[in-house]
Amino acid sequence: MTLSPYLQEVAKRRTFAIISHPDAGKTTITEKVLLFGQAIQTAGTVKGRGSNQHAKSDWMEMEKQRGISITTSVMQFPYHDCLVNLLDTPGHEDFSEDTYRTLTAVDCCLMVIDAAKGVEDRTRKLMEVTRLRDTPILTFMNKLDRDIRDPMELLDEVENELKIGCAPITWPIGCGKLFKGVYHLYKDETYLYQSGKGHTIQEVRIVKGLNNPDLDAAVGEDLAQQLRDELELVKGASNEFDKELFLAGEITPVFFGTALGNFGVDHMLDGLVEWAPAPMPRQTDTRTVEASEDKFTGFVFKIQANMDPKHRDRVAFMRVVSGKYEKGMKLRQVRTAKDVVISDALTFMAGDRSHVEEAYPGDILGLHNHGTIQIGDTFTQGEMMKFTGIPNFAPELFRRIRLKDPLKQKQLLKGLVQLSEEGAVQVFRPISNNDLIVGAVGVLQFDVVVARLKSEYNVEAVYESVNVATARWVECADAKKFEEFKRKNESQLALDGGDNLAYIATSMVNLRLAQERYPDVQFHQTREH
């Protein structure tokens, strides 16, 4: 049975994101993936070491200075017979809220681990988010050109700490200065590593068969024998790869390599296009939407300001769930119940924009947004339903924001509301005074906000400490009890950027007391958009 042209396009798509701890090599691996997808000709110098060519996926001013990917950009490239969409996730310690939401828009994740360090804190947090939807995970053990921990130990650590079985696909031969290459367990082939070839795709020499004398000649008798001994252990002690268990999020195929040396990345990509799922069904408040449906649906998971400094615009990133986008089509924005004609949607190669004529499930569209689109918005061809599972997370850090020039209050508020709509920060306006309180998940977000207020809104602002420990969104089914709660707690209530009521607690004890005193009021740690 041949698939219709539409279903063939759906079957070709693979949409994934990379999760890692900062400095595990995520930006480098992103570049090498794009290199294999022929999206860039030579891999850029990461963090622009003495050069102007910044890593292709890091592009806001502050990122240029700090060498971190603050924003979540999207890159599409062909690989074998597939079209791959890579959603770049902010790799720095602080950008978790955006990163969490990006993970709601992918069908698969690549976990990058620094093989010298093993599982790190950030990796744990991001894995927890992928667990909410049992997202399939591939694993790349990076930095084999340095001295690493024992590979068996690394697998044990992933299994014990992240509660996912490991199925090694490739196995390293030596490491650091002695790194010779990897052996592919399922193809019975050894791929030999050459150093100093990291910027281009290299011709790799392949030795067939584990007992081939050419292997001993290529890597030395000692390393060849060590490899054979280790593989006996590996085959006895680790999981075999099983595609169904992988798709259920229960085991992860593990690849070894060095992103900087551009070695092993293609093995991982081969596995990704072969095993990762095509666009998956998604839940709405009324039903499940299948990718094969012919009516268009999609949801917004991120809003990005000023992707292009020359254009003062914002772009809403929308994941296509079903149907085909065609230029000029009319879509219903469910939240406002308004129909809009989308004639200028964008697709991305980070930093470069091009207009899209058509897009399919799994693809990410950029919609020009002049303040009318919010995170979590659903677009359909008329059906009134809303995709679920795109949350806001209660901030953990708070500052009061103050203007250097009091006359610019209006611009400040506008800037903060826009920044909160795109998820860069959350803003709370206390009901009882004129303060503006900014909430974030990590400290660096505060710096980003001040820098962006200055460059985009021409507003100079400074922070002051504020006596706020946490915030919870509040609601109550009983209107009378809710009125009483609001009356008695006015000094601790605030409206967020979307005018939702929140309780601002001065301490965790204060929050617990309020929850005990008002059992009918619900205090929410996350809020569905």
From Swiss-Prot:
It comes from the Bacteria. It is found in: Cytoplasm. Residues 11-280 form the tr-type G domain. GO terms for cellular component: cytosol. InterPro entries: EF-G-like_DII (IPR053905), EFG_III/V (IPR035647), G_TR_CS (IPR031157), P-loop_NTPase (IPR027417), PrfC (IPR004548), RF3_C (IPR032090), RF3_dom_3_sf (IPR038467), RF3_GTP-bd (IPR041732). GO terms for biological process: maintenance of translational fidelity; regulation of translational termination; translational termination. This is Peptide chain release factor RF3. It comes from Escherichia coli (strain K12).
